[in-house]
Design a protein with these regions (language model features):
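Intrinsically disordered, low-complexity regulatory segments
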Residues: 1-154
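A short, hydrophobic C-terminal helix/tail in secreted or cell-surface proteins
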Residues: 155-160
Length: 160
């Protein structure tokens, strides 16, 4: 099974349609040997000191070295800054999809931002599967089919 991760639901659904992954699940599409899932933009952010159990930070506590520099995006509510529930739920779905697959295709934007989004997600979820990069310039059926063909997939050049 091959997992494809996009950075927007509409892109994921379009790629899934072209590849024949037409069975809708909660947060992803599956079928024809593919599981296509998506993020909602940046669902991860830098961890705050309180995320690593530090209630109050003083100069003597520096340098702060949290167990992870990334955490689930937080949103401001009446009770303060809390983890974004929607981001947390989608991250669990993405983790489930990636764990069920042998290969992962990064289909986020082919920009620094899109690459960073995928690499942060890959590291945060502690993925070990090999990754390929999908370079796509439009969402036409022909462009998607051509981009998914073996010659247009490139292995990540650096260790993730």
């Amino acid at each position: 099974m091959i997992a494809i991760v996009t950075d927007r639901p509409n892109v994921g659904r379009e790629i899934a349609r072209v590849l024949g992954a037409d069975r809708k699940e909660n947060g992803y599409m599956t079928g024809n040997g593919y599981m296509v899932t998506w993020t909602y933009g940046n669902m991860l952010s830098l961890a705050m000191p309180k995320d690593s159990g530090t209630a109050r930070v003083e100069w003597k506590d520096f340098p702060l070295l949290p167990p992870s520099f990334l955490t689930v995006r937080h949103v401001k509510t009446d009770t303060g800054w809390n983890p974004d529930i929607n981001a947390l739920l989608q991250l669990k779905i993405i983790a489930k999809v990636l764990n069920a697959c042998d290969t992962i295709i990064a289909a986020t934007d082919a920009s620094r931002e899109g690459e960073m989004l995928f690499r942060h997600l890959y590291g945060f979820l502690e993925c070990k599967q090999p990754c390929l990069r999908l370079w796509i310039s439009s969402l036409t059926d022909e462009a998607i089919t051509e981009a998914v063909s073996y010659t247009h997939l490139r292995a990540h050049e650096t260790e993730l």
